[in-house]
């Protein structure tokens, strides 16, 4: 592997966090920082990176590994997270993911009052208004849980801290953050990678794990290709206030030709949404005044597609005219029998954002001394809501492979030890990405023949208990 040099800002004063946590020490540039050795260095402290660190720490076989958790962001600040306005970055957790969090001791630290379980999903075709209902049996486990990503990070981080504080031995996990990697280069012997940083000197590791997202530094260093394509679609997200619920929490998804629109419940009459649409429409929606945007969002769950298509073509620089059209069309549609989300009353100021959507999957998950997981290895459309769950399943599989290697005296950084992880996850993720891609393309079609077949398919699906049970199992337990 060739070395990868990244620009970073050097600091005169270099803070480090002691293993006992909460105690900050400072080393000055004049002091010599010795090269430090790790068994594993995880790059990225999002939910996937933190889950991997927590999982390694709680597994009786892997807890002896010396682990470094490195991130350019100071994720340590989240241990004192103040619970304020809901974040617009949320994830749907399967029961399988929830049980993994419970197994590693993180679920106890999650703020349950900010997590919304739900047992019902209603999905509809935006052209024909045909729909399917997915409902868990009364008394069964929730179908899924909606949570802010920051709540998951808070729970994982505090579970790690709790274990470190209660470990009578010297803790084997070190937080290396905030920390910028300036260079990655090939090491010697079993310490395969040298990591040059701005604040923690030079580190060496047997295994470097990239949990650092779609723009992964680790993936680029390892020269692992990630084939894929852009969807020419942007996802608009935000946090909502809604009319008080009069029944159980329900997730709604409407498949429009411009892209799917999802409404996902949060506690205390809050909700989040993911509105996948064409880039020029997303840009126009972001510029709308908040009041008009809320009307447009309500309308997008209620109006027929020809009405929405007309509205998309309006000049959004004149919100008053858009408001007039929305008010009139919603009034006409008021007595519709369509099942729709509760009325959205406002969008939390500053919560609107948009990002491009892409499908991509790496050719390799592992190389000598390298492993990738989560978004560093695969990106997909959010329409199925399984992005984080597939990342957590990567984490479980990787921990299992490392545990097996340690038990059998193998080198944890060798390709031989890492191949079981690749074999387990690549095909499953590839199938999932392919299904989501085909589903997205199917519902983007406006051909009358295709829409007729879709309507028939949805009708048959809605009447098939076996098909529903299969989908419910996937939603609840992941891929």
Curated annotation (Swiss-Prot):
Reaction(s) this enzyme catalyzes, per UniProt: 4-hydroxy-3-(all-trans-decaprenyl)benzoate + 2 reduced [2Fe-2S]-[ferredoxin] + O2 + 2 H(+) = 3,4-dihydroxy-5-(all-trans-decaprenyl)benzoate + 2 oxidized [2Fe-2S]-[ferredoxin] + H2O; 2-methoxy-6-(all-trans-decaprenyl)phenol + 2 reduced [2Fe-2S]-[ferredoxin] + O2 + 2 H(+) = 2-methoxy-6-(all-trans-decaprenyl)benzene-1,4-diol + 2 oxidized [2Fe-2S]-[ferredoxin] + H2O
Domain of life: Eukaryota
Keywords: FAD, Flavoprotein, Membrane, Mitochondrion, Mitochondrion inner membrane, Monooxygenase, Oxidoreductase, Ubiquinone biosynthesis
Subcellular location: Mitochondrion inner membrane
One GO cellular component term noted in the UniProt record for this chain: mitochondrion
Membrane topology classification: Peripheral membrane protein
Gene3D superfamilies in UniProt: FAD/NAD(P)-binding domain (3.50.50.60)
Pathway info: Cofactor biosynthesis; ubiquinone biosynthesis
GO biological process, one term: ubiquinone biosynthetic process
Main localization, broad class: mitochondrion
Reported cofactor(s): FAD
Parts of the chain that traverse the membrane: none
EC numbers, comma separated: 1.14.15.45, 1.14.15.46
Disulfide cross-links: none
Matching HAMAP family: COQ6_monooxygenase
Subunit structure: Component of a multi-subunit COQ enzyme complex, composed of at least COQ3, COQ4, COQ5, COQ6, COQ7 and COQ9.
Role: FAD-dependent monooxygenase required for two non-consecutive steps during ubiquinone biosynthesis. Required for the C5-ring hydroxylation during ubiquinone biosynthesis by catalyzing the hydroxylation of 4-hydroxy-3-(all-trans-decaprenyl)benzoic acid to 3,4-dihydroxy-5-(all-trans-decaprenyl)benzoic acid. Also acts downstream of COQ4, for the C1-hydroxylation during ubiquinone biosynthesis by catalyzing the hydroxylation of 2-methoxy-6-(all-trans-decaprenyl)phenol to 2-methoxy-6-(all-trans-decaprenyl)benzene-1,4-diol.
The family this protein is said to belong to: Belongs to the UbiH/COQ6 family.
UniProt miscellaneous comment: This protein may be expected to contain an N-terminal transit peptide but none has been predicted.
Name of the protein this chain belongs to: Ubiquinone biosynthesis monooxygenase COQ6, mitochondrial
Gene: coq6
């Amino acid at each position: 592997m060739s070395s990868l040099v990244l620009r970073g800002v050097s600091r005169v004063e270099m803070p480090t966090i002691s293993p006992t946590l909460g105690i900050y020490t400072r080393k000055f540039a004049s002091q010599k920082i010795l090269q430090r050795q790790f068994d594993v260095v995880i790059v990225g402290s999002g939910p996937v990176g933190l889950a991997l660190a927590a999982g390694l720490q709680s597994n009786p076989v892997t807890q002896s590994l010396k682990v470094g958790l490195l991130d350019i962001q100071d994720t340590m600040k989240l241990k004192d997270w103040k619970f304020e306005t809901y974040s617009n970055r949320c994830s749907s957790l399967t029961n399988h993911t929830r049980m993994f969090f419970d197994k590693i001791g993180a679920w106890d630290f999650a703020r349950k009052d900010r997590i919304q379980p739900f047992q019902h999903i209603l999905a509809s075709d935006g052209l024909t208004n045909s729909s399917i209902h997915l409902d868990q049996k009364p008394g069964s486990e929730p179908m899924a849980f909606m949570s802010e990503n920051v709540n998951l990070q808070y729970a994982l981080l505090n579970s790690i801290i709790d274990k470190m504080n209660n470990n009578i031995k010297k803790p084997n996990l070190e937080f290396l953050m905030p920390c910028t990697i300036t260079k990655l280069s090939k090491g010697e012997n079993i310490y395969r990678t040298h990591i040059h940083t701005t604040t923690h000197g030079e580190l060496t590791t047997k295994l470097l794990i990239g949990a650092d997202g779609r723009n992964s530094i680790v993936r680029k260093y390892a020269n692992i290709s990630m084939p894929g394509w852009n969807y020419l679609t942007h996802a608009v997200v935000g946090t909502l206030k809604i009319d008080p619920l009069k029944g159980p929490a329900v997730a709604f998804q409407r498949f429009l030709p411009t892209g799917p629109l999802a409404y996902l419940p949060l506690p205390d009459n809050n909700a989040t949404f993911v509105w996948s649409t064409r880039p020029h429409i997303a840009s126009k929606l972001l510029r709308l005044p908040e009041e008009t945007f809320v009307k447009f969002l309500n309308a997008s769950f209620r109006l027929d597609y020809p009405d929405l298509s007309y509205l998309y073509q309006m000049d959004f620089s004149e919100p008053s005219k858009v408001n007039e059209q929305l008010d009139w069309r919603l009034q006409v549609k008021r007595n519709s029998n369509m099942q729709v989300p509760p009325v959205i009353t406002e969008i939390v100021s500053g919560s609107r954002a948009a990002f491009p959507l892409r499908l991509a999957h790496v050719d390799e998950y592992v190389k000598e001394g390298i492993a990738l997981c989560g978004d560093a290895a695969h990106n997909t459309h959010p329409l199925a809501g399984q992005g984080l769950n597939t990342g957590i399943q990567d984490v479980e599989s990787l921990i299992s492979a490392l545990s097996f290697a340690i038990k059998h005296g193998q080198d944890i950084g060798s390709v031989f030890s890492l191949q079981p992880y690749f074999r387990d996850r690549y095909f499953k993720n590839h199938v999932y990405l392919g299904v989501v891609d085909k589903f997205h393309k199917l519902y983007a079609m406006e051909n009358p023949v295709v829409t007729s077949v879709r309507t028939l398919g949805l009708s048959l699906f809605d009447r098939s208990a076996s098909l529903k049970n299969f989908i419910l199992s996937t939603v609840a337990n992941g891929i």
